[in-house]
Amino acid sequence: MSNPLVYCLPDGYTMRPRDFAADPWQYQLVIHRGFDNDGTPEKWDDELLKRIPHANDALKTFAIANREYCAHCGLWYTTGDTAYVEPVATVPEHRKRGLAKAVVYEACSRAHALGAKRAIVLSDQAFYSRIGFTLSSEVYDWEHANSD
């Protein structure tokens, strides 16, 4: 993250400012719809969201159009060198416009300003390599085989 992360939002979209108080229902909808869920979700307990350890609302980025949250990047960072990107979602009708890249770049830039030197994502989706992430390590899931 040593080079500036540059993105361009399409006309009609804005990026959520750092001091913006996110609307919990809009936040829930962008996650629900961005992961291709149908229907209307059951409302989350807003108080529960406030108690998530290490949550930093200034690092939650949203691309917004007409007061609707269209794309989101969550990012976890406390101290040290590493920020963790998770989750990233774009509402289907707003895809293919560069919004996911924009929210990821904005979130990473905010973490960099706080001291993060790198950002990682635990995903091998091609999207992340297209926007500049490179493989730094691999994770293996080991399971014990039953001898039954």
Mark where each language-model region is.
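Short, hydrophobic beta-strand segments that form beta-sheet elements in well-ordered domains
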Residues: 1, 119-122
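Acyl-donor-binding surface of acyltransferase catalytic domains
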Residues: 1-19, 139-147
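Hydrophobic alpha-helical core bundles mediating ligand binding, dimerization, or RNAP-core interactions
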Residues: 27-32
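A conserved beta-strand-loop-helix scaffold within acyl/acetyltransferase catalytic domains
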Residues: 36-89
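Short acidic/polar active-site loop segments enriched in Thr and Asp
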Residues: 81, 117, 134
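Conserved acetyl-CoA-binding loop-helix of GNAT-fold acetyltransferases
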Residues: 86, 90-92, 96-113, 121, ...
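Conserved active-site alpha-helix within GNAT-family acetyltransferase domains
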Residues: 101, 123-142, 147
